[in-house]
Amino acid sequence: MSEIKKENFVHLHCHTEYSLLDGHGRIKNLVQKAKDLGQPALAITDHGYMYGIVQFYDACKAAGIKPILGVELYTTQDIHEKKDRKTGHIILLAKNEQGYKNLVKIESIAAVEGFYYRPRTDLKVLKEYHEGIICLSACIQGDVPQLLLEGKQEEAYALAKEYKDIFGEDYYIELQYHGLEDQKKVLFPLVTLAKTLGIQVVATNDIHYVEKQDAFAQRTLMCMGMKRTVDDTEALGYGNPPHWYFKSEAEMRKIFDGVAPEAITNTMVIADKCNVELKRGEYHLPKFPLPATIKSNVQYLRMLCEEGLHRRYRKDAETHRERMEYELQTIEKMGFVDYFLIVTDIISYAKNHNIPVGPGRGSSAGSMVAYCLGITDIEPTRFGLLFERFLNPERVTMPDVDIDISPEGRELVIQHIIEKYGEDHIARIITYSSLAAKGAIRDVGKALNLEEALVMRVGKYIPTGPDVTIAGILSKNKAMKKEYDENADVRKLLDISTSVEGLIRHTSTHAAGVIIAPDAMTEFVPIQKDKNGAIISQFEMGSVEAIGMLKVDLLGLKTLDVLNAAEKAVNSKKQKGEVKLDLTRLKMADRSVYAMLSSGQTTGVFQLESAGMRDVLRKMKPTCIEDLIAAISLYRPGPMDSIPKFIQNKHNPDTITYAVPALEPILKDTYGCIVYQEQVMQIVRDLGGYTLGRSDLVRRAMS
């Protein structure tokens, strides 16, 4: 295999799929193209937002490409004026860590204070936060090129000089040429302006898709966003030639060597200037505000745990002390003391204000410390739950406690968090909605102006459900394949729909996630406002976790409000002196309840009400809480295949066999079936001789 030739050119103006309904190039494909061409670096400059920064950074690092982190922002004279919708463009690239921090601040100000139809910045903001940032004059929509187009040469020169005064040698006049008339008009005037003012020029290609043949798909995508059709020439915006693809150095030199050859060389100069590292393995935990009498967070956590140990276990407290001490030492060693104090405070606040909170879910139920602190109400040893599944000293990751909470009280709890840590320290988390198969076909059909009947007919081939892809259905459905082969409109519809399938359609706010930062949120994460005016991160859940932010999941669960209302309704009928109903103290061995469940009378019962689950309960005939836990755990894709064996073994215990005797104590409660990930960990520990920490690594590799 021949060695890839190294190119001396870098693309510094590149739109990914995070330029919503405009960027067609997926990050992984753009990065791979840079690698294939031998280009040493690549920039991300999405429209208005920094959504894809972390994914882009990771993809570049994995491919051996230097990531250049940036954004294409909109400019206005004064971000506080909300009258004129007209904006210019600039490209901002981070040179170093300080530059990246300033980029986050500029972006956040633009998306919060400066937002008027789109995020906007101005010279005043740029003056304050310019350190460590390179500025390019952007595309034909840049404010300097626009002034030249309008014949306002003096104003163009004056504005370019202002940018130069702010950024110095890090301000560049950006040159682009895609055959547009407006670009022809300003190309040489921009070169002249740069020479006159002593500003360097740089060549870019304003990438919106990877390959030349992707042009029509990208144009269709753009029309989807504009709610127009490809027949509407106004929607096309930038002419017919497919020039906005990922070009090689040779292709770029062919355009610019006769204009300003240094514009190509300067891409490497800029790339050499940009050296940002997004550090991993660091956690940005806020300090929990301690009572005046407490000297340290460790002292306070231990005091609360000691109180909880005696409250939870009473006379058996000492028998559980060893495990609690092990957990505490692990928490202290891993540096997560403040995390536990913060979560404890949140749940305590909710309970003290009569806001229903769930008993605990997920791996946090395996922590005795969480149980003693009141974070969970599930005693871990009774159910064989393992602390290492939650917090593994051999795999340092942030703890993750999911908190089920009353939807009616959720905002009150969030307000408490804001008051405790400061409004500028808190943000909800963004989430992205992608174009699913059926939706892609519908939207592409509209953009292509195809007959509605045809689009609806093709759409009916696509079933609803997760993991459904157009290509997957096309490979299995003969009728659909026949139409694809014989009908050109169907083929065009499905080809373009497949091309845009999975791209981000719009953003919304995550139902549960809240970030708490040790300093102002904009020291770590770019922010914006959601449609309700709440501050949200521009990074989605995975990116927030990747950069080490503390995330708390407050999941509004309506069932908690229903249970709370039911408890109150029952108690309102109680006579004076009668024992009040307390749902937290219900007996788990009530035969009449299991008889009702076994008959499938579970309509309205959380997680047990679907027709399929009712059928499982009728066949399983649960007799204990462990049976219910197993039923819920098994009733999902994959593990569902084990349900018949589980039921068979439950009703015929004499037929249960174990591959080796050591499996019996681990699998006895689940009738010889492996149901839980904790069982996997125990098997690896007992049969493989691993520690529980190492066993957890095996579990993660399997899951």
Language-model features and meaning:
Residues S2-S703:
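Alpha-helical scaffold/interaction cores of sigma-54-like transcription cofactors
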